[in-house]
Amino acid sequence: NSIDTALYSGVILTHGSDTLAYTSALLGMYFRHFDIPLFIIASNKPIGEKGSNGLFNFTSAVGLIKEGKYKGVFTLYERVMLPTRVIPADTCRDRFGVYGYDGFNDFSVFSGVSENMLSRPRERIFHNDVKFGKRVLFIEGYPAMDFGCFVPNEDTAAVLYSPYHSATACTDVSEGKSYALTEFIKRCITKNIMVYICGLKRKVPIYSTVAEIIKAGSIPIYTTSAVAAYMKLLLAYNQEEMPVKEVMGKDLFFEEVKFS
């Protein structure tokens, strides 16, 4: 917050690769207003070790800053990516993905976000430092899930549930209420804890179970990666400058992939 951007051509933040996607999403949303390039970079291996891409990522960031082509926050790891769409690296080849990117049909990894859109001035929303005292419970869906295993504590401000790609989940109570997401949602709401469901698509017919999940009181987060949704919730519930609902309703820095 204390950086006078008029004094610099750009900023390079070196970061560990394990949590690169998470920090990238958070900084992209918080520093959405940056009028100079902020590149977040990492390395797959220690600098100097054979096969390390760290020096390439660093020199690429320096070169792009000198070009003056980009304005705003970006992640640079072998390619330039929107920070709010970076998917954590796989555990096999340490390669990061881009949420919503269709390699066959997308000319750019920015997926529908033009350079003109990126260059437009953006309103500064967050002015104060944020202390992350409130927690968000992050649950990823899988078969035979028992929601009785999840007990939000007093520091839990919200729950994020990341479902299958069709956004479906078990709502059947015949085998027991603890297996139904709808019952878990109701249990959380009685404790004044809201449950958010990420990855839903706008203007797409939904399955009956998805309708039940929303009817139970959950809040949808549309076409946003689980990583970006999680960090957005952490930011929304811990900042004190605007209502949570207003933060969650804004597309802060292209985290929502919008289809034409």
Residue ranges, per PLM feature:
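Active-site histidine-anchored catalytic micro-motif
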Residues: 1-260
